[in-house]
Amino acid sequence: MSITAERKEALIKEYARVEGDTGSPEVQVAILTERIVNLTEHFKTHAKDNHSRRGLLRLVNKRRSLLDYVKNNDKDRYSSLIARLGLRK
């Protein structure tokens, strides 16, 4: 259900703006998206796990907040980020 250290490191390398960048909004959104995808898969087999569903909602809200921050500060970064993550249709 949680992401492995190797997968997290790969996401950091892929979305980092500079070498060693772990805290930029792009990296945070990528990690949150991976966790959201994992939880979504979890709910396909554990539909009544309401405790984890609350955690999923918190992750989605945190990601939305970070995406709003990126959108307000740099629309080009926002557009490229959602395209890379495949979040919007």
Curated annotation (Swiss-Prot):
Signal peptide: none annotated. One of its GO terms (molecular function) is rRNA binding. GO terms for cellular component: cytosolic small ribosomal subunit. SMART domains: Ribosomal_S15. CDD domains: Ribosomal_S15p_S13e. The keyword Ribonucleoprotein applies. GO terms for biological process: translation. Pfam families: Ribosomal_S15. This is Small ribosomal subunit protein uS15.
